Amino acid sequence: MADDPAMASSNPISDDSLANAYTQIFQILEKHNIPATFALVGLFAGAYEQYVDSRGDLLESEPHRNWLQVPERSFAAGLHDGWFYPELVDQIKSRGNHEIASHSFTHLPLHNEGVTEESFFTEMKFINQWKQINSIELSTFIYPRNQIKFENGLSDFNFVGYRQCDIQNSAYTNRFRILQDECNIGRKSDAHSLSTKPVAIPPGTFLNWRHGPRRVIPKWVTLKRWSNVLDHAVASGGVAHLWLHPHNLITARGQVELFGDAIARVAKTQKSGLIETVPQAEYCKEIAQQAQPRNHE
């Protein structure tokens, strides 16, 4: 949403609504004892003052300067509400069982016009600074808008995996095809990743955002679709990887309940001993271990 012109004058997301959305996510995950990966945009998971400190260097990059036009207009108008969440890192760390991953530093889509490998390195430089400030390790990466590029360079910055992209979550997919996929109650789980460096984590299943045209999709269809993914993972030994955007809980009616019901289905399957729930970094570690040659006596 960082490039939505409306954000410069009327941000639909406030500090309070953002904090409430994350509180609800934490409560649902804790209720069912489910670990998760939280992929954060470093710039906005910090304070406005930290943005001011990095602003000069960022705006020297033309792709970043173009990308940050909307936030710049918002901040120039004195509108900071809903943009920054500096408490989030500590809130995640305090839970003890969740992973913090990187969702870039500025959310710059790497397929934007003018984006080069130097732009990618600029992102990585600021990500490194951000993780040092917050005393965290970052092991996995989720590309902004799922636009994958320069993935071979991630290992140079100690990333062991990144989330792959499929038709469902591609930025270029026709909206009608997306709606078709959201209504596909026969959706299957993903096959396991190969042991590559970095690991291409299965793209997973997006939890329908009940907003705009998507809100016509009944809740039962979304839950049936997700249940089928879980059942197929159990039957085939595949991967059931659910993901969403936290701001979806703010901008869509009934999204909190939908997320809670989807996680309850995960918990039920886990309690039956049929699946194991792990964050992305642990999944990549398991894939790497499985690929190691075994000693035979």
Regions found by a protein language model. Name each.
Residues 1-199, 220-242, 249-297:
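Catalytic alpha-helical scaffold of carbohydrate-active enzymes acting on polysaccharides/glycoconjugates
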Residues 199-215, 244-248:
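Active-site clefts of carbohydrate-active enzymes
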